[in-house]
Every structure is written in C-alpha cells, then in structure tokens.
Amino acid sequence: MGPASEVYGRKLPFFLGYVLFVLSQIPVALGHDAPTVLVFRFLGGVTSSVCPAITGGWLADFLLPAERGVAVAIFAATTLVGPSIGAITSQVQLQTAMGWRMTAWTTMILGIVSGVAGFIILPETYLPVVEQRHARKLRQETKDWALHSRLDEKPVSIREFLTKYLTLPISMLVSEPILLSMTIYISFTFGLIYLLFVAYPVSFVQERGYGAIDGTLPLLSICAGIIVGAFYASWSTLTTVKQKAASGNALVPEDRLHPMIVGAVSLAIGLLWFAWTSSPAISPWPQILAGIPIGVGVQVILLQSLAYLIDIYTTGAASAISGTMIVRSLVGGTFPLFAPQMYRKFGVSIAVLIIQ
C-alpha cells in the first residue's frame, strides 16, 4: 500500500488497509481452530502494516524538517508504547471469562473508534492527487475541459502499477545501500524489543515468582524510557535547527544520525544492565530500572532512522519505508519464535548478553 499512496493518494490506501485490519479481528475472535486464527492473525499483521508504511510519506507532505522531527517523535513513541502497554493489558484480559478472544474484540473496538476519528480529521495531503481533484472541480465549475493536472497527463494503469510501483519497495531496498543498511539496523533493533517481551515474563514470572500480571508491569519502565527518548530526540532536533539557523544553514538528513549514536550507546548500556541484574538473588528494582535506557535507545534509534529516511525520500518515503516495514515485521515476528528456547538454554542473563 505504500506505493499505492504515491499513485492514489495517502488517505484511500491508508484507510483501506485500516478497515481490513479491523475486520480481520472478527474471525480471530470467533475462530474455533488454530488455522483460522493463524491465517487471520497473519492477514491482520499484513493489513496493519499499511498505516506505519504510509504515515512517513503523509508527514513529509506538509511538515518542514524541524516540525517533522517532533511529529515523528510522537508517532514513533506510540508505535513502541503500544506493544509495551499491550503486553500488560492482554494479561489482564486473559483473566476474563472470554480469555484471549477478548484481546481481538478490544482491538476491533479501539480500531473502529480511532479509525472513524482519523477518517474525519485527516485530509488528503499528497500534492499530485490534491491537484488532480482541484483540476476536476475546476472543470466542473468552469466547463473548461482543458484544465488538467500533472497526474492527468500520465495516468497510471493497473498493469503499470502492478509491474512498476508494487515492486518499488523491494527494488529500492536491494538497489540502495543506505536504505538497506538502515533497514538491517532498524529490523535488528525492532527484533530486540520483541525478544525482551519474552525475556520479561521469563525473568520476573518464572525466575522471580511474580504473578502473570505483575510480571509484565516492569515493562512500564521501557515505556518511561520511550517517552524520555522522544523528548530527547525532539530537543535535539530543535536545538540543531537553532544552531543551523544561527550559522545560516539548513537542517540536512545527516543531522538525524547524531542522536542515534546516543541511542545506540543507551540501548547497549540498558541491555548489559538488564542482564547483569537479572539474578533472582538481586533486588528486582535495578533490573526494572534497566528498562529506561533500553526504552530511550530503542525510541531514539527507530525515531531518528525513520526521520532520516523521510528526509531523504520525501514524497517517495512511503515506498522506502514499506520495504523497511516488510523486513522489520518479519524480524519482529520471527525473533520471539526462538526466544523461549534461547532463554531456557542459556538463561536470561547470558541470552541478553548474546543478543547485545
């Protein structure tokens, strides 16, 4: 859908994917066999990836680089806080009479509410499509049928869309070293988060003896770190803009990379901290507090890398980010598959040191 947003506008592909994601929750909630649940979980994951893939291009349409940095900070924070909070709330819902099915119904209800609000509030921002609609309106009002937009001059056929635009994210990914290297780093960082989602229950529930719900509450420290990271990245962007303006220069994409160094160091420190304090013989508080530098590191890395790609590709950012989303989602989905065996074989401390 990322390439589709560069042909048909941002809004239509965005909400088409969104509606399909919401509808995919119904078979999950009502399914009585594993294949049904797994198939529609997969489809839900595919359709939900449309939103983050298109959001980058949407923000690039109407925000200046300085404003974009703050907006991306908020967006990136929500995409990371959501899974962390979801790991906690899902444990609460599992204790209800409906069990795991309640998580699907909750997702659907929240999706409907936020989707309706978003459809009403969010405008179309992709300039070629806005121009095309404006030209169509003027033709109707003036009866001057010669009025047309740039998009009208070279309409995209279905065949051209399937052969050129649909393959664009993959072709960009394999042909552009910057995009490929950034995608590898983003994907590995994203995978670490989902490995930690498995590590926390193992460490706090199985090893420290916490309850199912209490064992997920330490994830709130990661949420706190994510919020701190968002503030730091926003402050860094605004400070850099002021310094550049004072010297008569403009913000360049490479300026986004400097805070990533801080984020990488923070993530490494947090993982070491978490591993070294994971022994049940040690108070849980040091291990809980390790989530703060982990959250800061993950937030700053993912946020600044996303802002960097948006700055480079601007109107083509949706296609670039779509390729990144494919790899990132595959890594985030496959890492937890081997996590239980890894933690069982090596223990939390050694396993976290290995991935660090």
Swiss-Prot record:
GO terms for molecular function: transmembrane transporter activity. Coiled coil: none annotated. Its main location: membrane. Induction: Expression is positively regulated by the azaterrilone A cluster-specific transcription factor tazR. Keywords: Membrane, Transmembrane, Transmembrane helix, Transport. GO terms for cellular component: plasma membrane. GO terms for biological process: export across plasma membrane; xenobiotic transport. It holds the Pfam family MFS_1. It is found in: Membrane. The chain crosses the membrane at residues 12-32, 42-62, 69-89, 102-122, 178-198, 211-231, 257-277, 288-308, 320-340. It is a multi-pass membrane protein. PANTHER family: MAJOR FACILITATOR SUPERFAMILY, MAJOR FACILITATOR SUPERFAMILY (MFS) PROFILE DOMAIN-CONTAINING PROTEIN-RELATED. Belongs to the major facilitator superfamily. CAR1 family. MFS-type transporter; part of the gene cluster that mediates the biosynthesis of azaterrilone A and other azaphilones, a class of fungal metabolites characterized by a highly oxygenated pyrano-quinone bicyclic core and exhibiting a broad range of bioactivities. This is MFS-type transporter tazK. It comes from Aspergillus terreus (strain NIH 2624 / FGSC A1156).
